[in-house]
Amino acid sequence: MHTNVLCVVTAQCAKHPDKVYQELKKLGAEYMQFIPCLDPIEGDRGVMPFSLTPDAYGRFLCKLFDLWYDDWAKDNYHSIRLFDDYINIMLSDAGQSTCSTCGRCGTYFVVEGDGSVYPCDFFALDQWKMGNIGKNTLEELSSSEQAKAFLQFGQQKPIECTDCRWSPLCNGGCKNDWERSGPPHNHYCNALQTFFAYAEARLCMIARAELQARRTY
């Protein structure tokens, strides 16, 4: 049985990437996902005790990558979805990346306890309610005005992505990480730039190794 673990990165968690990674491996996690914790919808980001700052997230990603890369080099690979995504994009295999890195949102049927349906678990908000699973068909839900509006929203990119050297990898990041007011901007933009500058050479090395392995299959 394969085990997939979703880890929410808080301010406290970000201080101990080595402990987090090793403990997840001890649990038998073969597939790992790390996402920044959510601040309350109302209010400023970064003011809660658990809030994850861009600087802390950048340091966390760099250290986590060191640990992950060391395992990969020892032929002890564990999947970390974010890193896998970047390698797939480098291999021009963007179809294997997820919505948080491909630059556009899809529409998923997220069903709440009362039957309400939303296009994404991060956007289970009244403005994006597509309908109700007990009252609407799947066709009606997928063709709803909210679904269409969400797909259009999901095509946007921050203006600073236009001239960013990392844009082909990052694609603006997950829309959930964007600032909640003002023009589109990823709250963790600096964290991602720090990470790419730190890990680029080794990401390329892994991508080349993966490409060679595929050619020998």
Where are these regions (language model features)?
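Radical SAM enzyme [4Fe-4S]-AdoMet core and its adjacent flexible, acidic
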Residues: 2-104, 110, 124-130
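Generic hydrophobic alpha-helical scaffold/packing signal
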Residues: 65, 99, 106, 139, ...
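Flexible mid-to-C-terminal extensions adjoining Fe-S/redox cofactors in radical SAM and related proteins
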Residues: 124-217
